[in-house]
């Protein structure tokens, strides 16, 4: 197994341009596919999850042209639903942002589509989405365990009507349903059961749908109306914002060991909820400066916080490791959906924080972290989870440094993360 040793870092300073958002990249690729016209996507993320989406679209007959560095994609829309005369089998790795939306989109047309994946994705639920699609007439068959991929879709289109979907596990299910609803045969009324998690991710979806010419009536996130007869039309160009979750590591670095760190590609105009991570750092004592498309973090003595972080689930992971450098006990609440991500992130985070000496209480949907008097060095397991690797790079700011196992797992969203991280040191 490959390991990366991060030696102690005294101070960080510099500027990082953040790669494109995974959430926006895969949503925009799918909407561009369903749209009429050609769409040019710029600052597209070049990572495993996006490659799985692109490979699947190509297999489904979608024509696109990628720039040499894979960050500009010119895609010819189908002007409607995806259909195939021959049976198709698509491999989607561990990419939830490809598996869930494609599962929904492939029910719209005609054909037989089988979606396969890595073993971890087979443990990540999709049942709430499939239940909703079945209410609209979809024929979806599970190939192994009920409620989980792999699965086969025998597509004949979706009817309109009323549909219920659970909102308390993952916002990706609702996102997938929203994106396909305009192409159903009739108007769709979506009723959300339970408290909707990760609402800002739904805002990303609605903003992109609007950019492609579709109107959704949002009744306070409890009900969504999508009137029949709409279609997606390419806006011509789509700029993919920098990934706000990826920005969190550099902002935390500035807060812990600044110096001053500036991230560009996200700012106050961002449509991503994870930019609010900077507000949490500010509550902890960091100095934060906002621009339209940049954020600056300057270091200070950090103090613990006790907050509901359901609105920033991915970026909240960075608070867990930043908490090791804060005075007092930090509590991150309402994060049950950490458990159904690339790994069970609550269990993984608790295990690895204890390795470096932290006192940790792992609840069903919260984590409580008290830093040790002296942080221990350790070998950090990353569970094939990109965010575990990037979060624990913060331990380079301890006097003993840290070793990261399987650092290349960052290829899921940020292949050259550790190179960029090293560029801030000095």
Curated annotation (Swiss-Prot):
Q: Which residues fall in a coiled-coil region?
A: none
Q: Which UniProt keywords apply?
A: Amino-acid biosynthesis, Aromatic amino acid biosynthesis, Cytoplasm, Transferase
Q: Where in the cell is it found?
A: Cytoplasm
Q: Indicate yes or no for the key word Nucleus.
A: no
**Annotated Gene3D superfamilies:** Enolpyruvate transferase domain
Q: Which GO terms describe its molecular function?
A: 3-phosphoshikimate 1-carboxyvinyltransferase activity
The UniProt record lists the EC number as 2.5.1.19
Q: In which pathway does it act?
A: Metabolic intermediate biosynthesis; chorismate biosynthesis; chorismate from D-erythrose 4-phosphate and phosphoenolpyruvate: step 6/7
SUPFAM superfamilies in the record: EPT/RTPC-like
Q: Which GO terms describe its biological process?
A: amino acid biosynthetic process; aromatic amino acid family biosynthetic process; chorismate biosynthetic process
Residues at which 3-phosphoshikimate binds: 22-23, 27, 170-172, 198, 314, 337, 341
Which cellular component terms (GO) are annotated to the entry?
cytoplasm
Active-site residue list: 314
Q: Which residues bind phosphoenolpyruvate?
A: 22, 96, 124, 172, 345, 387, 412
List the catalytic activities from the record: 3-phosphoshikimate + phosphoenolpyruvate = 5-O-(1-carboxyvinyl)-3-phosphoshikimate + phosphate
- What quaternary arrangement does the UniProt entry report? Monomer.
What the record says about family reads:
Belongs to the EPSP synthase family.
General function of this protein: Catalyzes the transfer of the enolpyruvyl moiety of phosphoenolpyruvate (PEP) to the 5-hydroxyl of shikimate-3-phosphate (S3P) to produce enolpyruvyl shikimate-3-phosphate and inorganic phosphate.
Q: What is this protein called?
A: 3-phosphoshikimate 1-carboxyvinyltransferase
- Give the species: Shewanella baltica (strain OS195)
């Amino acid at each position: 197994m490959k390991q990366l040793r991060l030696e102690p870092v005294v101070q960080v300073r510099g500027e990082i341009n953040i790669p494109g958002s995974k959430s926006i990249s895969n949503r925009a690729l799918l909407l561009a596919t369903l749209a009429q016209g050609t769409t040019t996507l710029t600052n597209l993320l070049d990572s495993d999850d996006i490659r799985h989406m692109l490979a699947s679209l190509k297999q489904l007959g979608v024509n696109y042209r990628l720039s040499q560095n894979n960050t500009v994609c010119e895609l010819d829309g189908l002007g409607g639903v995806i259909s195939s005369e021959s049976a198709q089998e698509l491999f989607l790795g561990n990419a939830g942002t490809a598996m869930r939306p494609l599962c929904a989109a492939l029910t719209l047309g005609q054909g037989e589509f089988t979606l396969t994946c890595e073993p971890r994705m087979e443990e990540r639920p999709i049942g709430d989405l499939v239940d909703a699609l079945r209410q609209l007439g979809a024929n979806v068959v599970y190939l192994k365990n009920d409620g989980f991929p792999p699965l086969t879709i025998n597509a004949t289109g979706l009817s309109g009507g009323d549909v219920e979907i659970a909102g308390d596990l993952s916002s990706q299910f609702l996102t997938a349903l929203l994106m396909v609803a305009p192409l159903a045969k009739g108007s769709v009324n979506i009723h959300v059961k339970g408290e909707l998690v990760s609402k800002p991710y739904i805002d990303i979806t609605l903003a992109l749908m609007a950019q492609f010419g579709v109107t959704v009536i949002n009744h306070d996130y409890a009900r969504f109306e999508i009137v029949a007869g709409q279609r997606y039309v390419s806006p011509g160009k789509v700029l993919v914002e920098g990934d706000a979750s990826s920005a969190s590591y550099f902002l935390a670095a500035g807060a812990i060991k600044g110096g001053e760190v500036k991230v560009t590609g996200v700012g106050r105009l961002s449509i991503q909820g994870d930019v609010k991570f900077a507000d949490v750092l500010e509550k902890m004592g960091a100095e934060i400066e906002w621009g339209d498309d940049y954020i600056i973090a300057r270091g200070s003595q950090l103090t613990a916080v006790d907050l509901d972080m359901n609105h920033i689930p991915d970026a909240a992971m960075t608070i867990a490791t930043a908490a090791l450098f804060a005075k007092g006990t930090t509590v991150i609440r309402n994060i049950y959906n950490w458990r159904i991500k690339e790994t069970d992130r609550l269990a993984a985070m608790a295990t690895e924080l204890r390795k470096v000496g932290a006192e940790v209480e792992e609840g069903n949907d919260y984590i409580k972290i008290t830093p040790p008097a002296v942080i221990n060095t350790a070998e950090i397991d990353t569970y094939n989870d990109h965010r575990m690797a990037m979060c624990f790079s913060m331990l380079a700011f301890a006097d003993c440094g840290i070793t990261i196992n399987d650092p290349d797992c960052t290829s899921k969203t940020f292949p050259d993360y550790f190179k960029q991280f090293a560029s801030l040191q000095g």
